[in-house]
A protein has these predicted regions:
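Extended, low-hydrophobicity segments enriched in charged/polar residues
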Residues: 1-96
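Alpha-helical oligomerization segments
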Residues: 103-155
């Protein structure tokens, strides 16, 4: 419950309006992506599954990983419900959600990534917004992140 509360507080502090959800799934032989897409779009009330963008990434061993990325426009979806499920992903939830969902705000130029109950990453273009988030939410940072964030805020 603490992880969810922290995720929501940071989510709302980062931006008041998210206009896209980017959903990314790794292609694997034993993975039924169509089932995940159906579940994701129906459970979280996305009307239509967009065409995927295929992304190839070479891992540290030289293997090529192929991801399918889907950009869902946000209309009236309950994004807090989606956040709750991401936080629960590793604890009896839908494990395909772990590390696979990004929330995008074009208004605030924010990328918000709650990867699971372990934490949140927020990419911010605006230095003032980064400072505001750091100042208002520094008590939510984990100790091991504090030194790096202080360095980034100082510039």
């Amino acid at each position: 419950e603490r992880a969810y509360a922290r995720a929501v507080e940071l989510f709302e502090q980062a931006s008041s309006e998210y206009d896209y959800v980017l959903f990314s799934l790794l292609r694997q032989e034993d993975r039924d992506i169509d089932t995940y897409l159906w579940h994701f779009s129906s459970k979280f009330n996305f009307d239509k599954v967009p065409e995927p963008e295929l992304i190839e990434v070479e891992d540290g061993t030289g293997d090529v990983l192929v991801f399918e990325r889907y950009l869902f426009p946000v209309t009236d979806q309950d994004l807090n419900a989606l956040l709750r499920e991401i936080v629960k992903a590793d604890h009896g939830g839908f494990n395909y959600l772990s590390s696979s969902v990004l929330f995008l705000s074009s208004q605030d130029n924010i990328i918000y990534h709650c990867y699971d109950d372990r934490g949140v990453d927020i990419a911010v273009l605006d230095d003032d917004k980064r400072l505001e988030l750091f100042t208002d939410c520094h008590d939510l940072l984990f100790d091991y992140d504090m030194e790096e964030m202080e360095r980034r805020v100082r510039g």
